[in-house]
């Protein structure tokens, strides 16, 4: 049997096409033909996978919230499905879904169980109770994991030194980007308006409220900026009702399948997340030549060097964020220089081909 016939199950929570799901899509399209996806319901991801003849199976009991009844139902359904299909590899994503998937896979005696950490959630927990709950869940999941993929050195440290994973089970494989597809706009001309963009779920983790407060403050001071938010999420409706302006300076675009063209026509990319693994959205923005203003957290700060290809600010600090944005207003030469640096940085370090080869080796070895 060749590696191409290996049966691989990818487990995701949401069928979106945001960063985590696009990482999965990139892996599936480049590696094996015999793939199956399990997620909570049908959506953009399952639609995109039709092109690759990938079977998609939905388990509606998979939810982000911890609910004992639903979680046990989801675990049982996962176990039955994995046992029936006899997968060689189960590759999980997301925190709680990843834990349920790993437990189900080991109970079904799957030979290789892999989990990708897209940012540990417990370091950013809002209370001690939440911290210890999420920490304990990740610690338990360790015993059901054969190989752990981390995207940055901070999560590698947490896995080995806090969760006590064995060193030979942890693999640092950063995300990668298709640099041919995500390329800068040729002969870009900067207007007097500073065009800002955020791509990501409008959710608690991404903290879009901090960005909206910062931009709203600048607009109230008559600073010539415009913000486009690309993405959906549980906070979209309430944020839109609070911050949408009649002058069109704050746009809630919703999700788009045309991220690359949206990035190209903007000037700066902003991501105010509370925690991350290694955001594909930042890699794609840098590859398109956008300097990035992002929070100083693991995953983000390994990609952005202050003053070189963007700048950093502390989480939930809308005042500092507004100052960082102001530092680019009326400075097209600064943006152009950091744009060139951003593109060069990606070309040297974060090609998609290199990343997929490392994942392939992990599957095969």
Model-derived regions: residue spans:
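Conserved acidic donor-binding segment of nucleotide-sugar-dependent glycosyltransferases
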Residues: 305-307, 311-318, 327-332
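N-terminal strand-loop element at the rim of the active site
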Residues: 10-70, 172, 233-235
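A conserved mid-protein helix/loop that constitutes part of the nucleotide-sugar donor-binding site
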Residues: 18-26, 194, 198-217, 229, ...
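A short, well-ordered alpha-helix in the C-terminal region of glycosyltransferases
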Residues: 105, 320, 327, 334-349, ...
């Amino acid at each position: 049997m060749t590696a191409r016939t290996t049966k691989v199950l990818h487990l995701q929570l949401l069928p979106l096409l945001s960063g985590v799901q696009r990482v999965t899509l990139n892996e599936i399209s480049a590696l094996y033909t015999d793939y199956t996806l399990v997620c909570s319901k049908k959506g953009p991801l399952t639609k995109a996978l039709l092109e690759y003849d990938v079977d998609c199976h939905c388990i509606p009991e998979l939810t982000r919230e911890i609910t004992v009844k639903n979680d046990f139902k989801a675990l049982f359904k996962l176990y039955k499905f994995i046992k029936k299909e006899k997968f060689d590899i189960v590759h999980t994503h997301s925190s709680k879904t990843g834990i349920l998937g790993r437990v189900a896979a080991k109970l079904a005696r799957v030979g290789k169980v892999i989990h990708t950490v897209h940012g540990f959630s417990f370091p950013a927990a809002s209370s001690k109770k939440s911290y210890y709950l999420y920490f304990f869940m990740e610690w338990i999941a360790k015993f059901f994991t054969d190989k752990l993929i981390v995207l940055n050195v901070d999560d590698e440290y947490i896995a080995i030194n806090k969760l006590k994973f064995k060193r030979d089970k942890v693999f640092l494989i950063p995300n990668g980007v298709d640099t041919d597809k995500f390329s800068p706009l040729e002969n870009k001309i900067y207007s007097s308006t500073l065009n800002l963009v955020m791509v990501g779920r409008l959710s608690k983790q991404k903290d879009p409220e901090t960005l909206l407060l910062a931009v709203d403050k600048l607009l109230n001071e008559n600073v010539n900026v415009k913000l486009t938010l690309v993405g959906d999420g549980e906070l979209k409706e309430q944020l839109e009702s609070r911050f949408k302006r009649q002058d069109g300076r704050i746009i809630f675009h919703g999700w788009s399948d045309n991220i690359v063209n949206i990035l190209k026509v903007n000037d700066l990319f902003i991501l105010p997340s509370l925690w991350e693994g290694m955001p594909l959205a930042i890699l794609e923005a840098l590859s398109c030549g956008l300097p990035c203003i992002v929070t100083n957290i693991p995953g983000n700060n390994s990609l952005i060097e202050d003053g070189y290809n963007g700048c950093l600010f502390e989480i939930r600090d809308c005042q500092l964020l507004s100052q960082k944005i102001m530092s680019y207003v009326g400075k097209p030469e600064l943006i152009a220089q950091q744009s060139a640096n951003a593109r060069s940085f990606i070309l040297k370090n974060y090609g998609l081909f290199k990343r997929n080869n490392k994942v392939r080796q992990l599957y095969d070895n």
